[in-house]
Amino acid sequence: WEIAKAFDYSAPVGKFKKISELKCVDDIAFGMKLNGEWVQQGHSRDMIFSFDRIIAHVSRFVTLNEGDIVFTGTPQGVGEVHVGDKLELFLEEKSVYVFQVN
C-alpha cells in the first residue's frame, strides 16, 4: 500500500483547525467531492479506534509534537483520480480545501 499512497505530492494538507473550534471531536463530519460529485462521506464516530486511543498507541513508538499529523485511514469511496480532476474536501459541511490534479 505504501507505493500507492506515499508518493510525491500525495498528501496535501490544508490549514489546521483548533480542536476548540469543533463541536465534538468524536463526531466530526468529513467528505470529498470529485468533480462536483460526492465520493466520500464519513464521521469520526465511525472510526474503529478513537483519536485518543490512536495517539496513545502511536506515541508509544514515536515522539509526537504539536503540528504532527497522524493519518488514520479513509471512508469508503476510494478511487482513482486523473489529471484535470477537481477535488474538494469538507469538514463539518464546510469546504476547506479545493485543488485540481495536475
Where do the protein language model's features map onto the residues?
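Catalytic-core "active-site belt" of small-molecule-metabolizing enzymes
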Residues: W1-F61, N65-I69, G77-N102
